Curated annotation (Swiss-Prot):
Source species: Rattus norvegicus (Rat)
Cell compartment(s), UniProt: Cell membrane; Basolateral cell membrane
Protein name according to UniProt: Large neutral amino acids transporter small subunit 2
Keyword Disulfide bond appears in the UniProt entry: yes
Binding site for L-leucine: 54, 247
Region (Disordered): 1-33, 500-533
Side Extracellular, residues: 67-74, 151-158, 212-231, 289-313, 384-387
Assembly and binders: Disulfide-linked heterodimer composed of the catalytic light chain subunit SLC7A8 and the heavy chain subunit SLC3A2. SLC3A2 acts as a chaperone for correct plasma membrane trafficking and stabilization of SLC7A8 and modulates the substrate affinity and specificity of SLC7A8. ICAM-1 associates with the heterodimer SLC3A2/SLC7A8; facilitates leucine uptake.
InterPro entries: AA/rel_permease1, AminoAcid_Transporter, L_AA_transporter
Chain ranges on the Cytoplasmic side, renumbered to this chain: 1-45, 97-117, 180-182, 254-266, 340-365, 410-424, 468-533
GO biological process entries: amino acid import across plasma membrane; amino acid transmembrane transport; amino acid transport; glycine transport; L-alanine import across plasma membrane; L-amino acid transport; L-leucine import across plasma membrane; L-leucine transport
Activity regulation information from UniProt: Leucine transport activity is inhibited by 2-amino-bicyclo-(2,2,1)-heptane-2-carboxylate (BCH), glycine, L-isomers of the neutral amino acids and histidine.
Length: 533
């Protein structure tokens, strides 16, 4: 894992005679081919990516986790509302960062540019090992659970069946994403519309219930009746469970370079999508408690299916199908965006360089998509979905906070750089206070879960110094990596994107500064600066 520009050029240097050959293999060897990621994501598709990634499985799974930890219906609803508001605050911070640093890769790119290569690599490392494979595995398992649950009305579906169907879902959507960016965005648009219709049905049924007088658990004296002893650590875990349901609000930042007019469409999509999702989530949870008691909700393995069975009668089959389609679209959106994160990391030299390549005709990052799919399939061996959600929530909030803190650092160190959007510093401060609350009490309540997440993240430190920072690797190792890259290129028919078309061109100064943070007490000379011509 060497620096991106050197990886892109070494093949062409070794095979200069292939420059005039136009075959896919020759294009792969030359590292060019004139292909680039296309700007095909407009405002509607951008909103579809945000909404589609947020509304995956969380609203259909996490209500159980939120209620269980909150201890009462009223407090659970407050958790949903506050989490939505904090998500909107975080999205405002990311909107400013997204137009200030207009690069794909999202918070990875922001952390790397502000705090340096090691910090950025740790964000990428934990994303590769835990966050995004876990997120996709949870959504895929939820998809299979909602598909199979009607076939097993008196018991839970078998674990082997759940995992097999989840794997089939992942493989199918990986093929779609590898085939065409347009296909992937169309699938996302269609399934986002479908999941909004499913949630609209839930909300409408809830309104009908309220009109009938079925709002026992919404009355204040009943809503705040605790069914367990209040515990501030468990309340923090309730916020983590809720944050999983809002997870994906920052995914559009991963595909900034494929956005049409990102300076306008990135903030517009955020401003439209986050309030919409918050509204839908709060009223969907209100609808749930009009038909189910807290005990019934906690006993259900598929909350939306139980809700449909109680209110739809013979038409109850609509709900599991709607939820399955919703989570299917969630897997598609997560594959689409997380593969761009790995693509961006490889382009910076933080992952194997083959992951920074795209297909010569389809212009899709096939190696990054295959890598994403494989890592998610490996994650499917983990059985406890709610433990996975806790891992994702804690580690995500850790890096969300670091990224938002970077916004303050960037304001201080680079006050004069262009900022098409400039929000009040009160917003990042509010977000960081909430972030600190979650982390402190999560560590107190679940030290083992949080400690495992931190330990996995710290394993990236030696990997960074051996794989990225160490430039003088043995020649046999470099030759092996280059041979493996060439074989992968020919198998996938992929090349490096043409520089300049996506706004990612690098200068010598960019390369020299690659591992240097904007915020550093004293300048440190990059080892590669001596190798620059």
């Amino acid at each position: 894992m060497e620096k991106g520009t050197r990886q892109r050029n070494n093949t062409a240097k070794n095979h200069p005679d292939r420059g005039s050959d136009t075959s896919p293999e020759a294009e792969a060897s030359s590292g060019g081919g004139g292909v680039a990621l296309k700007k095909e994501i407009g405002l509607v598709s951008a909103c579809g990516i945000i909404v589609g990634n947020i509304i995956g499985s969380g609203i259909f799974v996490s209500p159980k986790g939120v209620l269980e930890n909150a201890g009462s219906v009223g407090l659970a609803l407050i958790v949903w509302i506050v989490t939505g508001v904090i998500t909107a605050v975080g999205a405002l911070c990311y909107a400013e960062l997204g137009v200030t640093i207009p690069k794909s890769g999202g918070d990875y790119s922001y952390v790397k540019d502000i705090f340096g290569g090691l910090a950025g690599f740790l964000r990428l490392w934990i994303a590769v090992l835990v966050i995004y494979p876990t997120n996709q595995a949870v959504i895929a398992l939820t998809f299979s659970n909602y598909v199979l649950q009607p076939l097993f009305p008196t018991c839970f579906p078998p674990e082997s069946g759940l995992r097999l169907l989840a794997a089939i879902c992942l493989l199918l959507l990986t093929w779609v994403n590898c085939s065409s960016v347009r296909w992937a965005t169309r699938v996302q648009d269609i399934f986002t519309a479908g999941k909004l219709l499913a949630l609209a049905l839930i909300i409408i049924m809830g309104v009908v219930q309220i009109c009938k007088g079925e709002f026992f658990w919404l009355e204040p004296k009943n809503a705040f009746e605790n069914f367990q002893e209040p515990d501030i650590g468990l309340v923090a875990l309730a916020f983590l469970q809720g944050s999983f349901a809002y997870g994906g609000w920052n995914f559009l930042n991963y595909v900034t370079e494929e956005l049409v007019d990102p300076y306008k469409n990135l903030p517009r999509a955020i401003f439209i999508s986050i309030p919409l999702v918050t509204f839908v989530y709060v009223f969907a949870n209100i609808a749930y408690v009009t038909a189910m008691s807290p005990q019934e909700l906690l006993a259900s393995n598929a909350v939306a299916v139980t809700f449909g069975e109680k209110l739809l009668g013979v038409m109850a089959w609509i709900m599991p199908i709607s939820v399955a389609l919703s989570t299917f679209g969630g897997v598609n959106g997560s594959l689409f965006t997380s593969s761009r994160l790995f693509f961006a990391g490889a382009r910076e030299g933080h992952l194997p360089s083959v992951l920074a390549m795209i297909h010569v005709k389809r212009c899709t990052p096939i190696p990054a998509l295959l890598f994403t799919c494989l890592s998610t399939l490996l994650m499917l061996v983990t059985s406890d979905m709610y433990t996975l959600i806790n891992y994702v929530g804690f580690i995500n909030y850790l890096f969300y906070g670091v990224t938002v803190a970077g916004q303050i650092v960037l304001r201080w160190k680079k006050p004069d750089i262009p900022r098409p959007i400039k929000i009040s510093l009160l917003f990042p401060i509010i977000y960081l206070l909430f972030w600190a609350f979650l982390l402190i009490f999560s560590l107190w309540s679940e030290p083992v879960v949080c400690g495992i997440g931190l330990a996995i993240m710290l394993t990236g430190v030696p990997v960074y110094f051996l794989g990225v920072y160490w430039q003088h690797k043995p020649k046999c190792f470099n030759d092996f990596i280059e041979s493996l890259t060439l074989v992968s290129q020919k198998m996938c028919v992929v090349v490096y994107p043409q520089e300049g078309d996506s706004g990612t061109e690098e200068t010598i100064d960019d390369v020299e500064e690659q591992h240097k943070p904007i915020f550093q007490p004293t300048p440190v000379k990059d080892p590669d600066s001596e190798e620059q011509p």
